[in-house]
């Protein structure tokens, strides 16, 4: 059939019309009902920057980065340049760190390196002529987990040894990697020293090498490969990297001065003490003779003087430029710096008698209370109670503020009521009415439910009372609604047990005095270091330390440390075991209320209760602390809920009294454990947050009762208290229920602690009546941990 054609099997629609500009009607339909939002500005006019100015600024920043890099490289250059510190850490047992070192040095073809010297020492200096570089090699004690952390702490490079035969143990080798990552690691390299044990031919070694590279990249994604030290080219590349690459910095470590001792000597100046002489090269921001130093496992000490043996390359350049200025030249050529009257003391607390007790309420005494404290004040006899202002939105006038009620502002005050606040009020009333009707039908004639308000109250016999109480508590244990719930024994007085607790309308909006009068507060509370603004103070102190440094990075010095004679027996040969000295910043030896962020270690599944002794390593210190755990929330009044346990998968705040740290260093929490392969159990990790004495921790206690009889909104409650005087004492504290109702105690009934309560709606028989009480938890002092 000529001219016949079939329909296309593909349907292609026409292109939609795309106008260049939308019509007015389309724009109206698009923006219908929307209100134009005024832009929020800073109040400053926008400064127009031309393209040429932007290019010039970028050029200046690039030039400054290059200049900083050149200055940092000068630290390690030259004959007297500082040695790069290399720590060798094998991750498996079948590797010998000395074998790794021997294969690295062998490729240098340097006859000046003595292998016998390598075999006899664990810490030594090596000069690589081929790359004109100095290296300080540290081989840690692989049986001591903390010594590995200490050696990696001062290292510029960490060389991780991997095995082609043995897998990395999750309980030891992998924990080393994770701990070093959390502590802070400068630069790292992965090497394999026994790949030939897999197979003699290289092509059969490839799979194992790729598997190890994948494993290493899992922890260090920026590292593309691991090196086979049995190949001379790979070993040479590793050595070249160690000698020529500029190591990354660790902020918290490099913001203080530190020295790895080459020589240690003691000069006796009195029968009980003398000068511990440390010789080494300065790293970090430097030292000042008026500041204290810290020696791990020994403590804090004062400096008597600092002697310079040789200048750093940076300082020699500065001296050369200042040769025309005689005064500056004289200061720069000074080689001995002695401490003076302005040096820091070793006092951890402020002297006694300097406390300021003006903030304390002298009239307040717990023994003078006639009822429970509510909203941060106690009802004292003959004392006027000041009215508190309600929190209102910003910009509200005094007249408008009168219309804001406390119950409206604090509607979300209780954590248990949050899950029900979104429910519709009408539906809640209908449900309650239906529930009450259903209960009344089911228990018709039951003596436990009283419909008549004027029906007489009958007390149960002691045996029946005990039986019903036992049944109620057995049922309660099956479904605990409130984690902070406490139970009172029938013979126990609620007044005596909960006398220091108070009621609050809203925990995060209350007015809680920081320096309140409390017999349970630490004796040294008013003598602690108090910092108004931690962040600004930290920046100022670090800046001042850099400017006041008398010995800077690269200087070779002798430090004369005032040292007691009885500690000499603990000092070991610095060529066999790492001996490091760290400079302390101003005020860092003083105790303060410090806060750590804390997250549980993934592999640790044991409970960690508050106030249990644990060891924390933060920065250069290790302390045994008894931390108080709290929620890491940001509350406007700096009052936070105390937590009894460290919960998994959450970040908590640990509070204690310990020396302050101005470098915001990472923290590792652990417990000594002789049965563990590492001799310690890693509990958690975090960061030093701040030093804040105004952070208040409130421990919550929830008393629960059983709704016993109902009449409209009046309910008879039992099992919350067991004495009528307890009911009268806590009568001022509001009540709440698990369904979101709120109420108050109306009157006490009988002698067994029953009481009538009025609520803002009807309750059901399945409801639980509760009362929240709060008590201040005070941080506890800490002690240095010496590894025992």
Curated annotation (Swiss-Prot):
- GO BP of this protein: endonucleolytic cleavage of tricistronic rRNA transcript (SSU-rRNA, 5.8S rRNA, LSU-rRNA); endonucleolytic cleavage to generate mature 3'-end of SSU-rRNA from (SSU-rRNA, 5.8S rRNA, LSU-rRNA); maturation of SSU-rRNA from tricistronic rRNA transcript (SSU-rRNA, 5.8S rRNA, LSU-rRNA)
Q: Which GO terms describe its cellular component?
A: 90S preribosome; cytoplasm; nucleolus; nucleus; preribosome, small subunit precursor
Chain residue ranges for the region called Disordered: 1-57
Q: Taxonomically, which superkingdom?
A: Eukaryota
Q: Where in the cell is it found?
A: Cytoplasm; Nucleus, Nucleolus
Record keywords = Cytoplasm, Nucleus, Ribosome biogenesis
For the Bms1-type G domain, which residue ranges apply?
82-248
- Family matches, as InterPro entries: AARP2CN, Bms1/Tsr1, BMS1_TSR1_C, G_Bms1/Tsr1_dom
Where is the sequence biased in composition, kind Basic and acidic residues? 33-49
GO MF term set? GTP binding; GTPase activity; ribonucleoprotein complex binding; U3 snoRNA binding
Provide ranges: composition bias, Basic residues.
1-32
Q: Which family does it belong to?
A: Belongs to the TRAFAC class translation factor GTPase superfamily. Bms1-like GTPase family. TSR1 subfamily.
| Role according to the record | Required for 40S ribosomal subunit synthesis. Required for normal export of the pre-40S particles from the nucleus to the cytoplasm. Its subcellular location and association with pre-40S subunitshifts from mixed cytoplasm/nucleus to all nuclear in RPS19 disruptions, suggesting it acts after the ribosomal protein.
Misc: Present with 1390 molecules/cell in log phase SD medium.
Binding partners and assembly: Interacts with RIO2.
Instruction: Write the protein's name.
Output: Ribosome biogenesis protein TSR1
Identify the species of origin: Saccharomyces cerevisiae (strain ATCC 204508 / S288c)
Designated gene of the protein: TSR1
């Amino acid at each position: 059939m000529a001219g016949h054609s079939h329909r296309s099997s593909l349907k292609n629609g026409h292109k939609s019309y795309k106008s260049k500009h939308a019509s007015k009607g389309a724009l109206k339909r698009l923006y219908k009902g929307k209100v134009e939002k005024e832009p929020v500005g800073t109040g400053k006019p926008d400064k127009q920057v031309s393209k040429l100015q932007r290019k010039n600024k970028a050029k200046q920043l690039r030039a400054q980065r290059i200049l900083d890099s050149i200055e940092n490289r000068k630290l390690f250059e030259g004959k007297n340049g500082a040695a790069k510190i290399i720590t060798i850490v094998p991750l498996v047992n079948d590797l010998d760190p000395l074998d790794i070192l021997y294969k690295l040095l062998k490729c240098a073809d340097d006859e000046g390196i003595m292998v016998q010297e390598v075999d006899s020492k664990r810490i030594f200096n090596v000069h690589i002529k081929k790359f004109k570089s100095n290296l300080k090699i540290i081989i840690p004690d692989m049986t001591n987990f903390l010594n590995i952390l200490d050696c990696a702490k001062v290292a510029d490079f960490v060389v991780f040894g991997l095995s082609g035969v043995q897998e990395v143990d999750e309980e030891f080798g992998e924990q080393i990697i994770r701990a070093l990552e959390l502590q802070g690691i400068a630069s790292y390299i992965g090497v394999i020293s026994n790949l030939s044990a897999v197979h003699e031919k290289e092509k059969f070694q490839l799979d194992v090498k790729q598997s190890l590279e994948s494993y290493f990249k899992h922890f260090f994604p920026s590292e593309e490969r691991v090196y086979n030290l049995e190949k001379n080219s790979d070993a040479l590349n590793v050595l070249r990297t160690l000698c020529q690459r500029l190591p990354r910095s660790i902020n918290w470590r490099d913001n203080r001065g530190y020295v790895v001792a080459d020589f240690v000597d003691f000069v006796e100046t009195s029968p009980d003490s003398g000068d511990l002489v440390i010789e080494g090269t300065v790293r970090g921001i430097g030292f000042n003779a008026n500041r204290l130093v810290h020696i791990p496992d020994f403590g804090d000490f004062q400096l008597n003087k600092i002697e310079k043996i040789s200048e750093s390359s940076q300082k020699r350049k500065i001296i050369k430029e200042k040769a025309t200025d005689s005064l500056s030249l004289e200061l720069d050529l000074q080689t001995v710096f002695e401490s003076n009257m302005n040096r820091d003391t070793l006092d951890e607390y402020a002297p006694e008698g300097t406390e300021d007790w003006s903030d304390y309420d002298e009239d307040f005494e717990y023994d003078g209370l006639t009822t429970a404290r509510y909203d941060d004040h106690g009802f004292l006899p003959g004392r006027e109670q000041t009215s508190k202002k309600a929190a209102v939105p910003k910009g509200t006038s005094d007249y408008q503020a009168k219309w804001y009620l406390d119950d409206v502002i604090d509607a979300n005050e209780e954590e248990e009521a949050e899950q029900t606040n979104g429910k519709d009020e009408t539906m809640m009333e209908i449900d309650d009415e239906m529930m009450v009707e259903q209960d009344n039908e089911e228990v018709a004639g039951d003596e436990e439910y009283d419909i008549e308000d004027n029906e007489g109250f009958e007390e149960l016999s002691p045996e029946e009372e005990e039986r019903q109480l036992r049944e109620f508590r057995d049922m309660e244990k099956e479904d605990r609604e409130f984690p902070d719930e406490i139970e009172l024994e029938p013979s126990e007085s609620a007044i005596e047990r909960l006398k220091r607790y108070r009621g609050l309308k809203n925990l995060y909006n209350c007015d809680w005095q920081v320096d309140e009068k409390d017999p349970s507060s630490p004796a040294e509370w008013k003598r602690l270091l108090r910092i108004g603004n931690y962040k600004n103070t930290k920046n100022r102190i670090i800046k001042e330390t850099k400017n006041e440094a008398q010995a800077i990075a690269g200087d070779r010095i002798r430090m004369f440390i005032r040292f007691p004679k009885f500690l000499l027996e603990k000092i070991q040969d610095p060529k066999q075991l790492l001996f490091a000295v760290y400079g302390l910043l101003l005020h860092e030896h003083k105790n303060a209320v410090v806060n750590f962020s804390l997250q549980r270690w993934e592999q640790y599944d044991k409970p960690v209760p508050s106030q249990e002794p644990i060891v924390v390593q933060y920065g250069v210190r290790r302390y045994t602390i008894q931390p108080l755990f709290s929620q890491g929330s940001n509350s406007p009044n700096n009052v936070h809920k105390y937590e009894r346990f460290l919960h998994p998968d959450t970040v908590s705040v640990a509070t204690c009294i310990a020396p302050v740290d101005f470098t915001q260093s990472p923290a590792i929490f652990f417990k000594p454990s002789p049965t563990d392969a590492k001799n310690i159990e890693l509990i958690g990790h975090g960061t030093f947050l701040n030093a804040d004495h105004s952070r208040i921790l409130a421990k919550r206690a929830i008393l629960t009762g059983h709704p016993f009889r109902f009449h409209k909104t009046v309910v008879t409650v039992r099992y919350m208290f067991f004495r009528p005087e307890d009911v009268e004492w806590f009568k001022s504290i509001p009540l709440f229920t698990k369904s979101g109702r709120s109420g108050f105690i109306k009157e006490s009934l009988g002698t067994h602690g029953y009481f009538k309560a009025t609520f803002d709606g009807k309750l059901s028989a399945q409801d639980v009546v509760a009362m929240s009480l709060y008590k201040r938890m005070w941080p506890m002092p800490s002690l240095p941990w010496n590894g025992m």
